[in-house]
C-alpha cells in the first residue's frame, strides 16, 4: 500500500474511533425520562425527553457514518436517502404496511404480492431498500416482517405527517434550487410564487388555495398539522396565561380573554382554557371557514369565528391575541401585515398583548429537526426565526418584545409583545 493511502486509512481509523468514543459518551448521558415540571400530568411545561441530547446523539451518529464511508462515498448518501424515502412512500401506497401481519409474523413476497394484487418483482425491489435502512425486516429470502419502526406507520397521526411531508413539501424543497435560479438567488416572499407553487404548478394560487381544490390532500395536511400540535402541546404552557389574566381587573363573561388566531382545530385554545379555569371571559378560536367547518369534535366553552389573517382582526379588546405556528408560514413583510391587523383591534396598550408561540432558533448549533422545519417553511415563503430576526420583525409591526419564555430542552418559545 502506498504511503499516502496508508496514512489516509490510518486517519479514517482515528476518525471512526473518535466518533465511537463521542457516541459512547452521549449514550451514557441519554436520559429515558425527565420529571415533568408542569401544571399536571396532562400538560407538562417541557418535553419528557431532553431533545438536545437526542439530537446530539443523532448528529454524532451521522458523523460516524461519514467517517466510515469517507468523503467520496458520503456524497452518495443523499441519493440513498432520497431513494429510501421514495421506496417507503411507494410501499405505503401499495398497502404493504397494512398487509403485513401486525404480530410481526413473516410473510413471503409471493404471498404479499398476491394479497395486494401487485407485481412480485417490483415488491422485492422496493423491499430491498426498506430492509437495509428499515423500517421492515428481511427474515429470509424474499421474506419480510414488521418491526417496531414500521408498525409506527399504522398510527394515523404518523401516517398523515409522513404523507404531507413527502407528497406536499418534499417536491417543493427539491425545487428550491430551480426557484433560486429563476429568481436570481432571492428567497421567496410571495405565497403565489414560491418553491411550493413551482413544484405543484398551482396556476397563481398559494398553497392553501391550491389544496382547497383537492379535498383529500387538504384533509391530509390539516390532519398532519393537528397531529403535530396534539403530539407537542407543552409549548402552549410556556406562557403563564393564568397568571397574566389574574393580574388584570376582573372581567364580565362577555369580555374576550384569549383569541387563538389561526388555531386550526382548537388544540391550543383548549389547553389554554383548561389552564385558565374559573376566570370569566370568552375563549375564541379563529381560522379559515373550511378549517372551522372541518373540526370533527366539540370544543367546550370555545367560540369559533371565521377570520382572514390579512384583514383587520374582527374581535376588539381581547386580553391576549395568541398566534401559534402561524407566522412561520409567512415571509417577514406578510408577518408585519398580520401583526398590524391585530394591532387595529387593541384598545388598551398597557394591558392587551400578543403572544407568539414559535421557534426561536439559536445563533449556532441548530438541530437537524429545526433546520428541516425551517426549510419546509421556506418552500412556502416562511421561516423559523432567530431572536435577532424576531427582534427585527416585531418592532416593524409597531410592537415591542416584552418577554421571551423558553425551554432549554427545545427551540420552542413564547414571545410576549405589547403595542408601542
UniProtKB/Swiss-Prot annotation:
InterPro entries for this protein: COMT-like, O_MeTrfase_dom, Plant_O-MeTrfase_dimerisation, SAM-dependent_MTases_sf, WH-like_DNA-bd_sf, WH_DNA-bd_sf
Disulphides: none
Entry EC number(s): 2.1.1.-
Functional pathway: Secondary metabolite biosynthesis
Family of this protein: Belongs to the class I-like SAM-binding methyltransferase superfamily. Cation-independent O-methyltransferase family.
Stored PANTHER family: HYPOTHETICAL O-METHYLTRANSFERASE (EUROFUNG)-RELATED, PUTATIVE (AFU_ORTHOLOGUE AFUA_4G14580)-RELATED
Protein name: O-methyltransferase opaF
Amino acid at each position: 500500500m502506498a504511503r499516502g493511502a496508508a496514512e489516509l486509512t490510518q486517519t479514517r481509523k482515528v476518525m471512526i474511533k473518535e466518533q465511537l468514543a463521542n457516541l459512547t459518551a452521549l449514550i451514557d448521558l441519554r436520559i429515558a425520562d425527565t420529571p415533568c415540571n408542569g401544571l399536571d400530568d396532562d400538560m407538562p411545561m417541557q418535553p419528557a425527553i431532553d431533545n438536545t441530547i437526542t439530537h446530539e446523539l443523532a448528529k454524532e451518529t451521522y458523523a460516524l457514518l461519514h467517517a466510515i464511508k469517507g468523503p467520496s462515498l458520503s456524497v452518495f448518501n443523499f441519493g440513498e436517502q432520497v431513494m429510501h424515502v421514495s421506496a417507503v412512500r411507494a410501499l405505503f401506497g401499495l398497502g404493504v404496511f397494512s398487509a403485513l401481519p401486525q404480530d410481526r409474523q413473516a410473510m413471503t413476497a409471493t404471498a404479499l404480492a398476491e394479497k395486494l394484487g401487485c407485481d412480485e418483482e417490483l415488491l422485492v425491489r422496493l423491499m430491498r431498500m426498506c430492509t437495509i435502512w428499515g423500517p421492515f425486516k428481511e427474515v429470509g429470502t424474499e421474506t419480510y416482517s414488521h418491526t417496531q419502526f414500521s408498525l409506527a406507520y399504522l398510527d394515523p397521526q404518523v401516517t398523515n405527517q409522513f404523507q404531507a411531508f413527502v407528497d406536499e413539501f418534499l417536491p417543493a424543497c427539491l425545487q428550491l434550487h430551480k426557484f433560486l435560479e429563476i429568481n436570481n438567488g432571492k428567497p421567496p416572499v410571495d405565497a403565489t410564487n414560491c418553491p411550493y407553487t413551482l413544484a405543484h404548478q398551482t396556476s397563481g394560487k398559494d398553497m392553501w388555495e391550491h389544496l382547497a381544490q383537492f379535498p383529500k390532500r387538504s384533509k391530509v395536511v390539516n390532519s398532519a398539522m393537528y397531529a403535530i400540535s396534539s403530539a407537542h402541546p407543552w409549548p402552549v404552557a410556556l406562557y403563564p396565561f393564568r397568571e397574566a389574566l389574574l393580574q388584570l381587573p376582573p372581567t364580565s363573561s362577555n369580555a374576550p380573554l384569549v383569541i387563538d388566531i389561526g388555531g386550526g382545530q382548537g388544540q391550543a385554545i383548549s389547553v389554554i382554557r383548561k389552564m385558565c379555569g374559573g376566570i370569566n371571559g370568552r375563549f375564541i378560536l379563529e381560522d379559515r371557514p373550511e378549517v372551522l367547518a372541518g373540526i370533527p369534535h366539540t370544543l367546550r366553552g370555545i367560540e369559533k369565528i371565521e377570520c382572514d389573517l390579512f384583514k383587520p382582526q374582527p374581535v376588539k379588546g381581547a386580553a391576549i391575541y395568541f398566534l401559534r405556528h402561524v407566522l412561520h408560514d409567512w415571509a417577514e413583510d406578510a408577518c408585519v401585515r398580520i401583526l398590524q391587523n391585530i394591532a387595529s383591534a387593541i384598545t388598551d396598550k398597557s394591558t392587551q398583548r400578543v403572544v407568539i408561540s414559535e421557534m426561536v432558533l439559536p445563533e449556532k448549533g441548530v438541530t437537524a429537526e429545526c433546520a428541516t422545519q425551517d426549510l419546509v417553511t421556506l418552500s412556502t415563503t416562511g421561516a423559523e426565526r432567530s431572536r435577532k430576526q424576531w427582534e427585527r420583525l416585531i418592532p416593524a409591526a409597531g410592537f415591542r418584545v416584552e418577554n421571551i419564555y423558553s425551554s432549554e430542552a427545545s427551540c420552542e418559545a413564547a414571545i410576549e409583545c405589547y403595542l408601542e
